[in-house]
Structure formats: C-alpha cells, structure tokens
C-alpha cells in the first residue's frame, strides 16, 4: 500500500511540476492565456481517457513482466521498475496538463488587474475543488458508476470546461471552427472510451500482481465484482463449491460450502458472529483486517 501511494504521489507531483515548467514561458507569450487554458483542459481530459486504455492493458503487461523475470532480488528490482513505469504512464500525462492550468488562470487574472491577490484566490479555489472532487468521486461516482464510467465522467467534465473557455474566448470565425472541431473530437473520444476500452473483471480479479497470470482457472466463475470507495471486491466460485473473496485481486477470505472447512474458516465465522453478539440489530458492521 505504501509503495502504491508513493508511486501515485510521485507521478502526480512530477506531472504537475513538468506542466508548470512547460507553461512558464507559454503563459507570458500567449495573447489569450484563458483560451490556452481551455486547450489544456481538453488535453487533460483526453489524457485521462487515454489512461483508461493504458490501465486496461496494464494487467497483461504486468503478466508479461513477471513471466520474463526470475524470482530473484534483481528480478524484483526490474519488476518494481516496470510496474512503476506503467503507473507513471497512467497518471503523469493528465497531471502534466493539470499543472499548466493554474499558472494560466493566474496570469489571466493578473492581466485583468486583480493584483497579486489573484494568486491566493486561484490556489484557494483549487484546494476547495480538489476536496470536493475527491468527496464526489469517492462517495458517489466510483460506488455508483464504477471506476471506468467515473473516470470517463470526470474527463468529460474537464473537456466540457475546456470547450466552454474556448467558446467564451473565440473572437473570430476560425477560432469558432476550431472550437467546433474540438467539440466533435471530445464527443468521439468519449464515445470510443465507453465502447472500445474494456475493463475485464476476470483480469482485475486475477491477482496478476501476485500470481503473474491474468487468467483464472477453468473451473472458476466470477459471481460478484464491484468497485468500492478504496478497493475493488470480487467473489469467485470454483467447481468444488469453494468461494473466494478478493480485494484488488488479493484473496482475503475463502469458504468451502460443502467440503472440508479450510483452516481459517473458524476465524472468519467468528468475525461475522462477534458483531451480532455485541449488538441486537446492527445496521452497519465494519471489519478491520490486516
């Protein structure tokens, strides 16, 4: 978990930094920084949609990496580098475009005569928006729509903001035409993301990061899969009536309905029974495990 967090944070901060570095001179030279911000918003949304394609294929890439490497210390180092490169490819492009927007909005306000106070205002609203975005994504978008549609929705909102800025700043017919073509591109990219990009639940539940295989056994049947606030949970049933509950592909619990109980089944049964013993009619039960 710590390794995943540091990869995510590194990719995001690096993307923001590189985006800010690139736009540093572009913002000063731009005659209309707000219009440039509109193009950056569209670029951010397109990069987010592209990340869906990378993510959907990441499981096969990890399987190939694990199959090509030996189970040694040096092999693990190469595995870590390979998976880090995949994670960076997923997150950094969209973060790059995100890093360009705040400087452009700041320059726009400064040119409009708002003074240095505009810098604090831009970053304050950015903080508020970040908090609101996390709250909406965690408590509504991902649980209700699932990971794929949640990302597509967020990307579409980004691109919609970009199109609004382009239309607002359009001063002549060529700019209006470019905005119209951009709108068509946004609709096409969104449609392709919904129809072409596939998140295969079987691959996501395979635990490829642990097993090196994206394929469950022939007698396995995926009977439940859902993206939650912080993890994706799956339930797999096998021909011998075993059922496995996995979190992000890692099996956390199993039960054999008709056969001999597994060694940890009493522990799992106790975890379910204890809350019921402590409360007559519980409405919500939280289980914390390690």
Which stretches of residues belong to each language-model region?
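Alpha-helical transmembrane segments of multi-pass membrane proteins
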Residues: 1-290
């Amino acid at each position: 978990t710590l390794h995943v967090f540091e990869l995510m944070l590194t990719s995001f901060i690096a993307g923001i930094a590189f985006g800010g570095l690139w736009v540093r001179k572009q913002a000063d030279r731009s005659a209309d920084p707000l219009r440039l911000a509109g193009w950056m918003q569209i670029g951010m949304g397109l990069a987010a949609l592209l990340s869906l394609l990378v993510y959907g294929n990441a499981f096969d890439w990890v399987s190939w990496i694990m199959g090509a490497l030996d189970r040694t210390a040096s092999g693990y180092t190469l595995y870590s580098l390979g998976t880090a490169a995949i994670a960076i490819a997923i997150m950094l492009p969209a973060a790059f475009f995100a890093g360009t927007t705040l400087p452009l909005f700041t320059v726009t306000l400064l040119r409009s005569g708002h003074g240095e106070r505009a810098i604090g205002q831009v970053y304050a609203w950015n903080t508020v928006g970040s908090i609101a975005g996390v709250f909406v994504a965690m408590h509504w978008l991902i649980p209700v729509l699932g990971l794929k549609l949640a990302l597509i929705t967020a990307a579409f909102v980004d691109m919609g903001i970009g199109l609004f800025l382009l239309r607002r700043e359009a001063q002549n017919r060529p700019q209006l035409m470019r905005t119209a073509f951009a709108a068509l591109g946004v609709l096409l990219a969104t449609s392709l993301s919904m129809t072409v990009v596939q998140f295969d639940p079987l691959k996501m539940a395979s635990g490829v990061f642990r097993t090196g295989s994206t394929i469950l056994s022939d007698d396995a049947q995926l009977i439940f899969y859902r993206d939650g606030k912080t993890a994706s949970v799956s339930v797999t049933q096998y021909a011998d009536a075993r059922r496995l509950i996995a979190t992000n592909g890692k099996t956390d619990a199993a039960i054999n309905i008709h056969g001999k109980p597994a060694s940890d089944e009493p522990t799992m049964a106790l975890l379910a029974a204890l809350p019921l013993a402590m409360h007559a009619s519980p409405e919500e039960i939280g289980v914390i495990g390690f």
